[in-house]
A protein has these predicted regions:
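Outer-membrane beta-barrel initiation region
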Residues: 1-105
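Residues on the lipid-exposed face of transmembrane beta-strands in outer-membrane beta-barrel proteins
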Residues: 59-65, 105-111, 128, 148-152
Length: 152
């Protein structure tokens, strides 16, 4: 497996370690000239005041669900959670709401492979994830997906 995963496994059950999963970031200023306001117009009174300038951030963490090996030596099962938000922080006239927050829980299995090209570690992962904005009716969006990958 990649060196990162090997090092993460060494600290996985330390009570003071939070492991990042996907990229964590804060973009204090983002701009879009194509904000699709129609769904908001149907439910929110403030839709006409949405700003083209907003902040965006993503927080993503994971936790192991097993301490010992499951099927083979060095494998792990994880739960991951990613939140991605678009915040109308510069829209003073509508009290700076969060325009959208997407929630993405996932469960995935990671295992090492007995293949060491150029002396490196390799592995594979397989998982399932769901993404939803947590809204209902016209503003609702969600999807499910299964995935697999090779770790080099």
């Amino acid at each position: 497996m990649s060196n990162r995963i090997v090092k993460e496994k060494a600290t996985a059950f330390s009570p003071y370690v939070i492991t990042p999963h996907k990229m964590n970031y804060i973009l204090p200023i983002t701009f879009t000239d194509s904000l699709y306001k129609y769904p908001y117009e149907q439910v929110e009174q403030w839709s006409e005041n949405l700003s083209d300038i907003e902040a965006k951030f993503q927080l993503s963490i994971k936790v192991p669900l097993n301490y010992n090996d499951i099927f083979i030596r060095g494998d792990s099962l994880y739960f991951g959670m990613t939140l991605e938000s678009w915040w109308q922080v510069y829209a003073d006239n509508i009290s700076k709401p969060f325009r959208e927050t997407n929630y993405q829980p996932e469960i995935f299995y990671v295992a090492p492979l007995n293949w060491h090209p150029f002396g490196s570690n390799t592995g594979f992962l397989i998982g399932a994830e769901h993404q939803s904005n947590g809204r209902s009716q016209l503003l609702s969006r969600s999807w499910n997906r299964a995935y697999a990958g090779l770790l080099l």
